[in-house]
Amino acid sequence: MKMPCFVASMMMLHTLLAADVNAKELVYTRAFADDDYGIYHVAVLHALLNATKEYGDVTLVPYPQPITQSRQMLSLLKGEADIMWSVTNQAREQKLIPIKLPLLKVFSGFKVLVINPSRREELTKSADSRTLKSLTMVQGSDWPDIDVLTANGYSVEGEDWSLWFDSMYSMVSRNLVDAFPCNVIEVHRDLERHKDKYVTLEQFHLLKYPNYEYFFVSPDNPT
């Protein structure tokens, strides 16, 4: 990311977060209740608030319960929460204000495949895109990735996601689907959490597409 764009994004987020000098709390949404979820994103928000102390002290507060991405968007639009983070798409940028600071840089669009070990023989180094497109994959039912993958000829099922994607890993473990494309940054952490399941990391293929994760705020309540 070029430095001028980075600085501009940081300044915009500073302005939005500090716009209401009387604000005492900033409510962020979350997908999981686990304390480990969103550590990086919350740390970024803390750093930004620490850099704008001249606007007053603001406390970060999690939304009372974990909710799906579609419900997170709704909570911002209703004024029940102030900020969320998510992979972007056109619909989200039309409804909310995106802060175009790529939180994971380009790596949000680098996906490796979590598979059942029984799939290793068919997913060899020589397997081509036709082989990959013959697989049934799984993603969160409200993730923008579904649209990207299906538009490019992949077969994808949507699943209501649960704590640390347990339902997706269980589907792979039970051979209900063939693969779960996962972010390269997060996959090893998640595999460690699901080491009790019969899953492994496919070694030879990488799905790569433009995919950026941003903070979002409501256009009606940009604080």
Language-model region placement:
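Bacterial N-terminal signal peptides
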Residues: 7-15
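Extracytoplasmic small-molecule ligand-binding "clamshell" domains
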Residues: 23-97
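Ligand-binding "clamshell"
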Residues: 24, 91-103, 190-205, 209-218
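Bilobed "Venus flytrap"/periplasmic-binding protein-like clamshell domains
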Residues: 34-48, 113-156
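Short helices/loops that flank or line small-molecule/ion binding pockets
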Residues: 65-81, 152, 166-186
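A ligand-binding cleft/hinge motif common to bilobed small-molecule-binding domains
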Residues: 75-77, 83-96, 178-199
